[in-house]
UniProtKB/Swiss-Prot annotation:
The gene is hcp. Binds 1 [4Fe-4S] cluster. It comes from Geobacter sulfurreducens (strain ATCC 51573 / DSM 12127 / PCA). GO terms for biological process: nitric oxide catabolic process; response to hydrogen peroxide. The lineage of its organism: Bacteria, Pseudomonadati, Thermodesulfobacteriota, Desulfuromonadia, Geobacterales. It catalyses: A + NH4(+) + H2O = hydroxylamine + AH2 + H(+). This is Hydroxylamine reductase. Signal peptide: none annotated.
Amino acid sequence: MGMFCNQCEQAAKGVGCEIMGVCGKNPEVAALQDLMLYGLKGLAIYADKARELGARDEAIDLFMIEGLFTTVTNVDFDPVSLAGKLRTCYDMKEKAKSLYETAYREKNGGHAPAIAAGPAAWVIASDLEGLVKQGLEHGINTHHTDADVRSAIEILIYGLKGMAAYADHAYILGKKDEEVFAFFHKAMAATADPAKGLMDFVGLSMECGKLNIKVMGMLNEGHVDHYGHPVPTKVPTGTRRNKGILVSGHDLRMLEELLKQTAGKGIDIYTHGEMLPAHGYPGLKQKYPHLYGNFGGAWQDQAKEFPLFPGAIIFNTNCIQRPADSYKDRLFSWGQVGWPGVKHISGWDFSEVINKALECPELADAPEKEILTGFGHNAVLGVADKVIEGVKAGAIKHFFLIGGCDGAKPGRNYYTELAEKVPQDCVILTLACGKYRFNKLEFGDIGGIPRLLDIGQCNDAYSALQIALALANAFNCGVNDLPLSMILSWYEQKAVVILLSLLHLGIRNIKIGPSLPAFVTPNVLNFLVENFNLGPITTVEADLKAALGQ
């Protein structure tokens, strides 16, 4: 069995990647990531059984999160790195097995029932070639023989991957939760249970969406505890004469540590992609004046943009792509990120990155326009009275949430055109890197409220939900009754879990694009349409008319 991967929006031919991943993933890496999922299922089976007996181990819990995060699109492409993580996965599975057996013996006496087959019985291969061979035996098409059940399993697993990314960020900020840890194990163990059926996995996916709201809330709390509530902030998109380091990814804690270590060294720090919202946090922007600006746009343009940045560049999460030789020697990875030949920084010492930046040429004085960020729920709800007054007076007719992941497909210019054609009496909320499709355009304001409100990163969907729930409360109605339309773009698994969170809340009439997930079968799609009226984007004109009830 060869490579097959369909987890992202760019799945080849709308079906799946079988020769080489559009993301850059080769068959070797795909096999190692498939084996990671298989190993994590084995770990989960034992950890779940141990938990039922009152035994748990935080190291096992944390590895489940890190292991899932590793397999998110555009995170780790390094076979050597993945092989090392697989060895840790096996060790953690065996540790969970011992934990279960000990807990069983202490409670019941005697030996625990042995599990002789499946992922719990996995024995790791001794070398990289053997690991790849094992991975090829456990691809996603082996998850279930029934296509619809397999589709439901994939939705759950991709939701778990997305939630794992957020849980990892939250953990780094000191936020963790026993219910969340337990669910990861329960859900992953369920994917290996042949007795589970379609509706079991639908239910688990809804539970995943529910818990993801909790995880996003934990991450929001971690950010606010460390850096304060975001405030509306103008961010330069040009450069100034100084040495520079460009930070791409999502992790604010890593950015903070880099800011500490570069203070007073004549180095400016620039954000890229999903790091842009960092400028809205007072504990970062106001505390560290060398956090200067945002360079470039969304992740898919890095091959064009990074050669133009003369300093050091570091990724702390996805989305890394194959680096060009023109900047590969200035590129670093951190956390779960990996690419063959790219220097990986373990821990919190960024001296290698700093030294590389000091060796590199200075950036030029090249001022460009400023863009606004920092409209988290605290900032928006701080002017809720104006917003409510604007709606009641008819000055604000409708809200559009236009955001999500960006990507390389030509059809994504739909979101630019949509934002441009939203009527002047409507407000646009945006988040994640999809905002780069239109965040340099001028939208003006309504009664002093900007028509474009950048809420933040993809995980700040939590803020968007708080805004929607507060408005619903103010107007004494449900979220579905608000003059609010959600037209979302997706690319990877964090978008999947955010969608699950929205569906858990019963939010209907969401449109997603530019294409529907390849892993959703027609029958599963029909279920989503019938129960949630979830649908694909069509044309800008038709979707606007539908949203505005015209």
